[in-house]
Regions:
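Conserved ANL (AMP-binding/adenylate-forming) active-site segment centered on the GW(Y/F)…HTG consensus within
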Residues: 336-338, 364-387, 418-423
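Conserved pre-ATP/AMP-binding loop-to-beta segment of ANL
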Residues: 18-21, 134, 154-172, 179, ...
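Gly/Ser/Thr-rich phosphate-binding loop
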Residues: 252-256, 264-336, 432
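Conserved AMP-binding/adenylation subdomain of ANL enzymes
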Residues: 191-206, 213-280
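Conserved AMP-binding A3 loop
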Residues: 34-38, 168-194
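Conserved C-terminal "lid"/linker of ANL adenylate-forming enzymes
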Residues: 433-436, 440-441, 471-504
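AMP-binding/adenylate-forming catalytic core of the ANL superfamily
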Residues: 92, 109, 361, 367, ...
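Conserved AMP-binding/adenylate-forming core of the ANL superfamily
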Residues: 23-55, 59-68, 72-76, 93-98, ...
């Protein structure tokens, strides 16, 4: 069912699935707490009442903290009240967060006590913020209000009156290069992106939400789409406990980024090499019910699609960007093309100009908040310049070849996509992470090796082994695509919140 505002999604879910579980989370080691769709709607309405009573309706309100029921209610209430939500990356330093709060003109801050340092820093430097709400405190304090206290003090229904084209979220990009930008998304941008595609997912599907909740992919697909379908959204409390939480919550589906999938792939490859039976191994690693993993955010080795299929798990590779709310395309369970990032969403069209993919549709952002120059560079006559190189086939499936801004132009004028070379080499298990770039006139590969794999494989001289892999690649590569310099790292590359490697 197609929706055009976020309050419409929640109201529908309340009517259709009121008594069913909406959100589950771990209360203690093996104890699960839950809230129904009716409870979610009632708490959202009550907190929206509180926002209006505090005089913050229509203003910009930031939310910061790990994934939690309180975070979800806060976001839904902000958007229901006609205010503008500003989700913040909880892993950033307090000083960086305060800069984002100022840039986004935030007037109210809702925070998890795990980041109480942000509230303290903001109180000193963000003078426009005059309301602070703690998600965890049980009582109101002079300087900080209690989330639960506000809900209890403002119980009652709320009648949202929000326009489809109203700004409802400013979401800062976690770009791999340059200054983060505040992407302006409307009610219709987010609601339609989450609900325009029927992926044949039935109600009561159990989803384990493992990605950072401030990230567009998680917010759209786990939370908004999940609510619209009457799913049971289970909150993963830590990436370190993800394997245990899979066993605890027994999900049907999980959204992951490729780095997570690669970790599981290594386990499956070990199992396959040992000749162990697939079904008991699948249950041990993925629980009794997991059947689908949705992947997005970066390149995924297409061979993993076949590997996971051997264990009864479907991988659906997708593609998107925050500026498109975020999903642009996805593979479908009944029509998987493993070398493609999927079929265009039904509310989206695409074309290529000079090799760059441009998209247009109802999911495309309004622009970057208070950054007109960058907006003009990215949006042209409604077309969003993705910065990605690729093409669309006759069936509407997208194939990506690299990033325009990363393109290497050789001395003889040849264009080389570093991603193409990275993908070709990263299939080798010795290479854990890789960046290809131009350095002093030649193509260089900087590699973080998998030392555990090297030890298990009896590789003593890692550098020589890596050089041998590059030499093997160079034999079949055109001269202008050959790698002539190798740099070996001793630590992982720095990454964004969505687990993309920062290229500079």
């Amino acid at each position: 069912m197609l929706f055009h505002t976020i309050p419409e999604i929640l109201s529908y879910a309340n009517e259709a699935y009121g008594a069913d579980d909406a959100i589950r989370w771990k209360k203690s080691k093996n104890e699960i707490e839950s809230r129904t769709y009716s409870e979610l709607k009632n708490d959202t309405d009550s907190f929206a009442n509180a926002i209006e009573k505090l005089g913050k309706k229509g203003q910009h309100i930031a939310v910061i903290g790990p994934s939690s029921y309180e975070w979800i209610v806060s976001y839904l209430a902000i958007t229901e009240s006609g205010s503008v939500a500003v989700p913040i990356d909880a892993s950033l330093p307090a000083a960086d967060i305060c800069e984002l709060l100022d840039r986004a003109d935030v007037r109210m801050l809702i925070f998890d006590e795990a980041r109480s340092d942000v509230a303290e820093a903001a109180a000193k430097s963000c003078h426009d913020i005059n309301v602070y709400v703690s998600m965890n405190s049980t009582e109101h304090c002079p300087q900080v209000l209690s989330f639960n206290g506000l809900i209890d003090d403002n119980r009652g229904s709320y009648e949202p009156a929000v326009a489809e084209d109203a700004l409802c979220t400013i979401m800062f990009t976690s770009g791999t290069t340059g200054k983060s930008k505040g992407v302006m998304l409307t009610q219709n941008n987010l609601a339609e992106n989450a609900t325009c595609l029927d992926m044949k997912i039935g109600p009561h599907t159990v989803i384990l939400s493992v990605l950072p909740i401030h990230h567009a992919y998680c917010l759209s697909m786990d939370i908004l789409k999940g609510i619209s379908l009457g799913s049971v959204i289970c909150i993963n409390d830590s990436i370190m406990r993800m394997a245990k939480n899979i066993q605890l919550f027994t999900p049907d589906m999980i959204l992951m980024v490729p780095l997570m999938i690669e970790t599981f792939a290594r386990k499956l490859e070990e199992v396959r090499a040992a000749g162990l039976p697939a079904e008991p191994v699948r249950k041990k690693i993925f629980g009794e019910r997991l059947h689908t993993i949705c992947s997005g955010g970066a390149y995924l080795n297409p061979d993993y699609v076949d590997l996971f299929a051997e264990f009864g798990i479907t991988i659906l590779q997708g593609y998107g960007m925050t500026e498109c709310s975020p999903v642009i395309s996805t593979n479908l369970s009944w029509d998987i093309r493993k070398n493609s990032v999927g079929k265009l969403m039904p509310n989206c069209e695409a074309k290529t100009v000079d090799g760059e993919l441009l998209v247009r549709g109802t999911s495309v952002m309004q622009g970057y908040y208070k950054m007109p120059k960058e907006t003009e560079e990215t949006l042209s006559d409604g077309w969003l310049h993705t910065g990605d190189l690729g093409y669309v086939d006759e069936d509407g499936y997208i194939y990506l070849t690299g990033r325009r801004k990363n393109l290497i132009i050789t001395k003889n004028g040849e264009n080389v996509s570093p991603e193409e070379l990275e993908n070709a080499l990263s299939v080798n298990h010795l290479i854990k992470e890789i960046i290809v770039r131009e350095s002093e006139g030649v193509i260089e590969a900087e590699i973080f090796p998998d030392s555990e794999y090297a030890q298990n494989a009896g590789i003593a001289d890692i550098r020589s082994a890596l050089q041998a892999l590059i030499d093997e690649y160079n034999v079949n590569a055109p001269v202008y695509k050959r790698i002539y310099s190798l740099k070996v790292r001793e630590s992982e590359f720095e990454k964004t919140a969505s687990r993309k490697i920062k290229r500079s």
